[in-house]
């Protein structure tokens, strides 16, 4: 019976020591886990791939009391916070007595991953896998007693704030090359008045009056022939 009681006391005492020391290191959170990578200009088979697995698991255990036989050991006024804004952690003493732990507040940047794949031709290339995980856990202001009197747990607060993550900076787009001088469109022709056309005419040779002259000459020859045949000598008139 004594051995069982002794083992139980040792187990509870160890649990109490763990509850006291856990706020010193378990509640501490760093600036978060982040990963950044890029795959560019890696042609080939299964090349230029990026796998990122940032994990951020802040755990807060503060303001807890574990007592076998406890009297007036409150756990009150403790605060645990996980903030996404970057900053340094600080430790503040809690308003508790006995074996109560201290309150620790830390800031965390959360889990973030950023990757890019550009100009990576090939089979199964330029791919990216990102699995950011953020699992904040808060355990604060608890009181465990086997036999306890006046051990309240009040006024405790736990906060998880992921904060606003800044937008990733995108590289500027490359400007398109300008067209060569030969391909550039030149200025259009100016609208000048067309010069007047000169009328082309043939030289006057008198051929337009030849036809009436020929007709008159033919009439005269015909008339002379008729008169000659009529009045020729030896005719039977």
Curated annotation (Swiss-Prot):
Chief site of localization: secreted
Null allele phenotype: A single chpB disruption has no phenotype; a quadruple chpA-chpC-chpD-chpH knockout has delayed aerial hyphae formation and sporulation. A quintuple chpA-chpB-chpC-chpD-chpH knockout has a longer delay in aerial hyphae formation and an almost complete lack of sporulation. The quintuple knockout still expresses ChpE, ChpF and ChpG. Quintuple knockout chpA-chpB-chpC-chpD-chpH has strongly delayed aerial hyphae formation, makes many fewer aerial hyphae but no effect on viability of the spores produced.
Membrane topology: Peptidoglycan-anchor
Pfam families linked to this entry: ChpA-C
Example GO BP: cell adhesion
Biased composition (Pro residues): 169-178
Cellular localization per UniProt: Secreted, Cell wall
Residue segments, region Disordered: 81-127, 148-216
Modified residues (Pentaglycyl murein peptidoglycan amidated threonine): 205
Motif stretch (LPXTG sorting signal): 202-206
InterPro entries the record matches: ChpA-H (IPR005528), LPXTG_anchor (IPR019931)
Propeptide span(s): 206-237
Signal peptide: 1-26
Keyword Nuclease: no
Domain of life: Bacteria
All copies of domain Chaplin, residue ranges: 42-82, 120-160
GO cellular component: extracellular region
Keyword annotations: Amyloid, Cell adhesion, Cell wall, Peptidoglycan-anchor, Repeat, Secreted, Signal
Induction details: Transcribed during aerial hyphae formation on minimal medium, about 10- to 25-fold lower expression than the short chaplins. Weak expression in aerial hyphae (at protein level). Very low expression on rich medium, unaffected by ECF sigma factor BldN.
Biased composition (Low complexity): 101-115
NCBIfam families, per the entry: LPXTG_anchor (TIGR01167)
Task performed by this protein: One of 8 partially redundant surface-active proteins required for efficient formation of aerial mycelium; the short chaplins assemble into a hydrophobic, amyloidal fibrillar surface layer that envelopes and protects aerial hyphae and spores, presumably anchored to the long chaplins. Chaplins have an overlapping function with the surface-active SapB peptide; chaplins are essential on minimal medium while on rich medium both chaplins and SapB are required for efficient aerial hyphae formation.
Family statement: Belongs to the chaplin family. Long chaplin subfamily.
Protein name from the UniProt record: Chaplin-B
UniProt source species: Streptomyces coelicolor (strain ATCC BAA-471 / A3(2) / M145)
